[in-house]
């Protein structure tokens, strides 16, 4: 914002007049739900008060030259630009657009059904940071409503938020108006909390129909299911202490280039994620940034 300070003296000098001198300052600060904010030094504002000085010999008027307009600074919400180098094929695998220039030995990490609780979410985020990995967190609207602070944390930690419907219902069994509501409400609440609108969509249970796909497309959402299921959600018959290793075993058995790996915000997944990512790296895999995926596929 350009602010100009002009101290104006009297145009006509009169003997015995009072000399006026204004002093004042104003500092503004702003806050946002964006991932981070940048403080900006305040510029003195127009004089707010006028004090009466002793009678002195009148002084000539003084005009402070107009300050130059400062160069605009980058917005605190500005994100790193990521080149579009991958696309999703019909099997929901992530493949390079240019196979000669872009590695094909990558996996896409995704986590469904959050945000649930800090105790599970924080270890997931910490592990992703440790491996410099990005993931899509497909969230449910009713959970975002209960824990907006957790959604904000996902965003502030640099991860990507996807739409997973409001109530986690089988959308393939619903009519268009219900589908519209389920997707639209999630778009709205994520935008309200983070200032960003999701661009990825995964239907719960992979349940879909033509209306689901069309409505998702109308909202600018890239529809996907997965190509590698960790089965971390299907552990009722697995002893608790064996579940972390079972997640790794399931992923490794289905591993392929471009794996679109489905996981959830579950305790055993959080416990084993570091080990899983380490093993993937040892096999030569890297983690694709979701922002590098072409949304027009």
Question: For each predicted feature, which ranges?
Answer:
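C-terminal domain-boundary segment and adjacent tail
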Residues: 93-101, 131, 268-297
